[in-house]
A protein has these predicted regions:
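Vicinal oxygen chelate
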Residues: 10-18, 60, 64-72, 89-106
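Core segments of cupin and vicinal oxygen chelate
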Residues: 5, 16-70, 109-135, 141, ...
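The feature marks the first
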Residues: 2, 9-11, 33
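Short consensus segments that form the blades of beta-propeller domains
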Residues: 3-4, 91
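Short, charged/polar, Gly/Pro-enriched secondary-structure boundary elements
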Residues: 141-147
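Ordered, amphipathic secondary-structure segments that act as subunit-interaction surfaces
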Residues: 71-79
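Zn2+-dependent peptidoglycan hydrolase active-site motif and core
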Residues: 86
Length: 156
């Protein structure tokens, strides 16, 4: 059985936080690992981010990643206060588990599959380095969280 995304491989569990620097320290201490660097979400000119189908040039965040197993990450996200799937979650629910992310090929087909399953597209854009694209879907009704797809482009 292929499922909606054609994969059951989990790549990431994402958490929304108010203070990424403090949250990184706590997660690192809990996991017994080094505190990772903080990354910016990237420039709109590169990412082309949309939110609810509209351009979202001001939506950005700070991120940190913990590689906890081969191919599996914990992602911490601190939204910048502008309208986004991240800020919406923080405003509605506070800090907590936000999404499960899955590696995919052909994001466009996955958008169609997810929307047919009743999970509307919330946010979409390119990685900050333009090396791939992501999409967030509202799966709160079905799965009690958001779903993110991650498509990494082959290196040229």
């Amino acid at each position: 059985m292929a499922g909606v995304l054609g994969t059951s491989t989990l790549a990431q569990v994402g958490f929304i936080v108010r203070d990424i620097e403090e949250s990184k320290k706590v997660f690192a201490e809990f996991l017994g690992v080094e505190v990772p660097p903080t990354w910016d979400g990237g420039e709109y000119e590169v990412t082309g981010t949309t939110y609810l189908g509209q351009p979202a040039p001001e939506a950005n965040c700070l991120m940190a990643f913990f590689n906890i197993a081969p191919g599996l990450q914990i992602e911490l996200i601190q939204p910048n206060g502008k309208p986004s799937a991240w800020q919406m979650y923080l405003d509605e629910y506070g800090e907590g588990m936000h999404h499960l992310a899955f590696p995919v090929n052909d994001t466009e087909k996955k958008v169609i599959s997810c929307e047919a399953f009743g999970m509307p597209l919330l946010r979409r854009g390119l990685y900050g380095n333009a090396g791939g694209e992501y999409a967030y879907f509202d799966a709160r009704k079905q799965l009690k969280c958001f779903i993110e797809t991650l498509e990494t482009y082959p290196e040229k």
